[in-house]
Amino acid sequence: MSEWVPNQDGLKQLVYVLNLSNSTSREVHDQIREELDKFHSVPDYNNYLTLIFKSNELQPHIRSVAGLVLKTNIKQYFEKMPREVQNYIKREILPVLSDPDASVRHTVGNIITNLIKKSCFSEWPELLPALNLALDSNSQDLIEGSLYTLSLLCEDSTKKLDSDDSGRALNQLIPKLIMFFKCNNADFRKKALVSISYFIISMPGALLINMEAFLKGIFSMSEDPSEAVRTNVCKTLVTLVETKIEFLLPYIKDVIQYMLHATKDKSEEVALEACEFWTAISQAEGCRDLLRDYLPVLVPILLNGMVYTEQDYEYLDQGDDSMTPDRPQDIKPFIASTKSHGSGSSGGGQDTGFVNPDNNNNSNNNNSSNNNSSNNNNNNNNEDDEEYNDDDDDDDDDGFEDEAWTIRKSSAFAIDVLSGIFPDAEYLSVTLPLIEQRMNEQNPWPVRESAILALGAIADGSKNGLAPHLSKVIPYLINTLNDPKPLVRSITCWTLSRYSYWIAQADGRDYLHPLVVNLLNRIVDNNKKVQEAACSAFATLEEEADLLLIPYLQMILVTFVNAFGKYQAKNLLILYDAISTLAKVVGNELNKPELINILVPPLLQKFNALDDSNKNLLPLLGCLNQVCSSIGAGLQNLISLFFNRSIKLIEGSLQAHYKYNNQDQKGSSSSSDQDFIVAALDLLQGLSEGIGTSIESLIPNSNLPHLLLQCMNLRGSDVLQSSFALLGDMSKFCLIHFKQYIPDYLNILTNNLYPEYLSVCNNASWAIGEIAIRMPDEVKPFVVAIRDRLISNINKVNLNRGVLENTAVTIGRLGIVSPADISPFVDKFIQCWCMAIRRKTDDIEKDSAFRGMWLIINNNPNGALRHLVYICDAVASWDKMQPDLYEAYFKLLHMYKTSMGGVWAQFYNQFPEQLREILNEKFKLNQDISQ
């Protein structure tokens, strides 16, 4: 192939355009973008970029932009590039690895990495030998460029490097990288270590056979003069502990001793990575035996790590700052918490018990087991500036992505995790005396503050062992709420929230009154951080104390109203959460004129002051949702005000959606539009829960049935979840007004019975069940399609408990609609159905489900026979059935007993003894009742 020759006029034109990138003008950048778009029609456009990028006689910013545009083009258009252009880039880019400009070398590394992502090593056979050879060069620039490139390849192409595609390059590469552990250049040592560390999890054979040399190399760098090297030594050891601890076990005592030393390193980055080791090893098998002897040394180190540094104090201690407006970057975006019907939330995740004490903002949490924050990120990634900004994270090799994670937080987390591993008596015998010493009033306030943080950190893991001490600890903490230092008051609020469970129990009940009084005082503190911590702590107390707070309602509401006049934007979000949590736990107790007259006016004032496009309206609507649900009819004429505003918000947001939809991507929606729709739908649901069937009078004068259908046709999981939840509630109270759209609703609901979107699936299933028992004729044509999806879901036994319960209820209700369509398949789901429904609280939903299941089983008793023990277990889960339902199942069970004749006794004796006792008592299965 003839050598490529550029057109000089075209080259000059492109250089001119790239040179404009030095401008700070947005208009100029738009012009650059337009001009570069025109170049895409030139087949060898990327050859020009490559040529400009490698030309060291050009100005650095021109070369830099050429390289970044080339990288972007490879990411987006590589497959469309002519093969000769691809080959030209590969051939010409490698020599630039020795460029004296480090930023140019790093751009080369990113280009190479993206080329391999888009193809493979076998299509560029010269690459790895060239990089390997470069490591033997006398040029420091070439070695650095090659090591940097290899670190990116090891991170992004781990599997490709350990494959035939690369010619098993790791067999040569890993030993050579280990040799760099001894070189004089600290940056080279670091890059070599980082590169190999990416293979620890996959553990290729090339690393396995060199593991002894690798470990010796790591240990040889443990006292490295470079902070960056020591940081990555600690990071590598943490990765080994987390994933391959067996390789460290022969050296584990030395490793632990080293980490004890490194956790106190003068370098904050080294100390932070070392501190992560304690959480990692705490989760390893047999960790108690490994760590037991070191607790007396480790715990003091961790406690010291929890003390605020002077820099922290200067940044955080803002004194009386309640009148200082929040900066926009201080305010987290509000995420609407959309409702998931059922007794279990959609997440079903295990709570580790540790809550970040330095981030008390729970405003995005409705603190409700029935609420699931369904954060559907409709991010419209704007890549307009990607060509001019190297925002790729390819070269982020420092390993620290979360700037907010500190030694203080890591130490507190380790203290927390350790408390759950060791027996309470053993752990507290070491920890409590140290904490008590630090609580002494003679100590500097940062030391006392760290002791209070430690008390909060161990609250859950050492719960039983701490109980005898709480009668002394809690009064101390309540008194400390009045400490002159804001950071002490703040952490005390958090720690008390960790013990609110005990205060709500009989043993701690005497402390409820002083806690409420003092915590309310802190809610209106003059320091914003204290306000935040106190408000969050009070929301936690509300959940634990529940109805015990009823005597304090007036005092609480007066404080909340005072806070409205004092809080800046960020803390208002937390205040809304505390109000909605209170409304949830005390329920209709709020429906008293004297309480309504305190709480509602400030909420109403804000409701009227905010226009429909103001995002500050979103958290307010979330708060009103629960307030309306609890107060209900007591809102009187405000009910129609809230209802009509919600309808208006939905209409406006849908119009904005359709406008956006016509202008941009079909089927997508602005996340802002969907946020308002979700908040308005949820407020309507709160109203319906509060006033019940009275909401029917509002429907005829609105177009809610059609609006709801439009919302259900949107794609966002959050808006679907809220739409389905509202439809379920409307089905309970006034379904007749929605009748004309039932077939459309059911089509959409059926198509969303997929557990990949758990809360959407959950609410769809529940809504179908609510419609089924009220309009069975309309549901009947859909039974077969719904049945198939629900049977599939009920057999996914690892699904969230609430989802399984709702699925079981809806299957049972479909049995009322059309038992003949369900009964032939009873053998496929009855066992899982029984296991799900037996855990459900006795209520009207469970009642209707059992009525439908009775019809299903009666239609096909033989199909259910081999699962009779599960049926009996489910029936026995009732405390008290309705008389007619009891009679039906009494006869059903005795029908099975009679049909089995002489084998019944042998079969029945295989039932668990406790189950037989219940069945004998309630259903007389041990007696002959034949006449």
Swiss-Prot record:
UniProt KW Transport keyword: yes
HEAT repeats: 10-37, 42-79, 88-121, 127-164, 171-201, 214-241, 253-280, 296-421, 430-459, 471-498, 512-545, 553-586, 594-632, 640-693, 704-735, 743-776, 784-819, 827-860, 869-900
MF-aspect GO terms: nuclear import signal receptor activity; nuclear localization sequence binding; small GTPase binding
Position of the signal peptide: none
Low complexity compositional bias, start-end: 358-381
A GO BP annotation: protein import into nucleus
Pfam family, one: IBN_N
Keyword Disulfide bond in record: no
Subcellular location field: Cytoplasm; Nucleus envelope
Residue span(s) of domain Importin N-terminal: 32-99
Keywords, sorted A to Z: Cytoplasm, Nucleus, Protein transport, Repeat, Transport
Annotated stretches, region: Disordered: 317-401
Any Gene Ontology CC annotation: cytoplasm
Biased composition regions of type Acidic residues, renumbered to the chain: 382-401
Main location: cytoplasm
PANTHER family attached to this UniProt entry: IMPORTIN BETA
Subunit architecture: Forms a complex with an importin alpha subunit.
Family: Belongs to the importin beta family. Importin beta-2 subfamily.
Protein function: Functions in nuclear protein import via a substrate-importin alpha-beta transport complex that passes though the nuclear pore complexes (NPC). Mediates docking of the substrate-importin complex to distinct nucleoporins.
Official protein name in the record: Transportin
UniProt source species: Dictyostelium discoideum (Social amoeba)
